[in-house]
Amino acid sequence: MALLHTHFFSESLGMQCTMDVLLPQKLTRPALPVLWLLHGLSDDHSIWQRRTSIERYTDGLGMAVIMPNVHRSFYTDMHQGLPYERFIADELPDIARNLFHLSPAREDNFVAGLSM
């Protein structure tokens, strides 16, 4: 699998953001199924590579794994904070699908995470 450390600008957050992406070495379909893997409060997106075997678990499944960094946002739009729910639910999938061959089909998208 390929591990990409990706930096991009978020219009909804108004700042540079990061996500780590695992991709299969070979495309087996025109658009990959995707696991959106969300970190917990005390960590960031890198925790999945540092403390789990996510690459080993997903190798051979023919799917992408997207691990975004959302800081301590609780993945919500805060009254006095940034619109992280909009970022995660709307903007990030569009950005990731434009950068990588990811399937937009509901049955090809999976969400998992820790804490928060």
What feature does the model see in each segment?
Residues 1-116:
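Non-catalytic cap/lid and distal C-terminal segments of serine-dependent acyl enzymes
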